[in-house]
Amino acid sequence: MGLEVAADSVASALAAQAGGAMRVELCGGLDGGGLTPSFGTLAVVRERLRIPLYVLIRPRVGDFVFDAAEVEVMRRDVEQCVRLGCDGVVLGALDRHGQVDLATMRVLMQAAGSLGVTFHRAIDVSADPSRVLEDAIALGCERVLTSGARASALEGIDTIAALVRQAAGRIGIMPGAGLSEHNIRALRQHTGAHEFHASARGVIAAQVPSPHPYIRDLGGDYQRTDTARVQRMVDALQQA
């Protein structure tokens, strides 16, 4: 049982490790739901991290229906993860009917080779999460990250519990979205899940005050994984 931390910087990844996370999911643009991280970020994190590193492969924001060019971008990103010695990748692709795009997933998983694969929250916007779960099992994914098709895992707690029962040990079900030190124990007890996913972030104040506060997307405060929050969440899990 343990906590995977979503990190979008070197500092966040190392903070997750220091707090006792069992694994890091590295991404970029976490505030937009997460994108594939930059090569530089990935390379430096791989060099410095001692715990397992999984990498989100998502070329853009928006839905999870990808065209041929986007699939090629993702395939090359997966290959880069293999070359850098990452432990796994986080994937997900749907077709226009809201079902798993099996052809795309097979291309990406073939590129991943022996790397572990997590099927991400595309399941939460699919037409049938139960069917997506079976497809993820058939594809050979290790786990599915899900909020139970709701805005937060706490809201989707009953669906997550049902997916855990359906999985019956064939694949991991990892609750994510809105997890904190205040609710992770309840999620563990109600769902029976063994792995949990959170960013565990806190606000970092801007080092240089902006002379133009009306320009909100440049400069200013930002968020970073908080080691103490990670530790509190890990402790809460151990007490569950």
Curated annotation (Swiss-Prot):
Its main location: cytoplasm. It is found in: Cytoplasm. It comes from the Bacteria. GO terms for cellular component: cytoplasm. GO terms for molecular function: copper ion binding. Keywords: Cytoplasm. InterPro entries: CutC-like, CutC-like_dom_sf. Belongs to the CutC family. HAMAP family: CutC. This is PF03932 family protein CutC. It comes from Xanthomonas axonopodis pv. citri (strain 306).
